[in-house]
Amino acid sequence: MISMRFSYLLLLVGAAAFAADPSAGKKLAFSDDFDGDKLDEAKWSVSGAREVFTFVKVGKGSALRIGLKVKDDMIQTNTLTSRGKFSQQFGYFEASMRMHAGDGHAGAFRLSTDDDKTPPSITTSFHGTGKERVSPWARAVLDSGAQDFRPDKAIGKFTDISKKFHTYGILWTEKGFTWYLDGKAVHKLDRKEFVRPMSLTLTHRIEEQDRPKLILKSLPDDVDIDWVKVWK
């Protein structure tokens, strides 16, 4: 009996260890360490204000910083995307990011179907909204129209989303999507109809409905990306 219980415990430990590493058994298909002083345009395209994309020192290396452009209305979307240069069907997509601190703007790590206007397509993301908040989120375009998918409750209380780098990951399989924060599964969406390749996007934006919450004197308040990896 003791031996059987011990074997069962080993199985549980093994399963937990595997769950903590969704890249296990996969090969690296795409990566960027942002260790240079300019963007690799073979991997990325930029939209928005190009001048807000800069490189900053992080430890012995560097990170990509996506800032905000100060202008009259402040409405903006500054985006780095692999669309048209890299996309993939299924796999594990992850990024090490330090989110912004304040309210009124949003940083995001996002996967989107390449042709995201043709159903069935989907955008899945980790969405940071300031004040140490981050949440998994998805929006699908279906034959019946657009549909959002969100957790029923917050995935946790955080105190350091803007103070340190965390690893945000999305595992996409034939069965659906699982969101990981620092290797721990925090949300799941079981939908099988999304099968077309997806590309990776990193963004920092201010939308019109969020603008009243923005405190200009709190700027600069940036989103930093240490690295990106995609596993197949």
Where are these regions (language model features)?
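GH16 jelly-roll
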Residues: 20-232
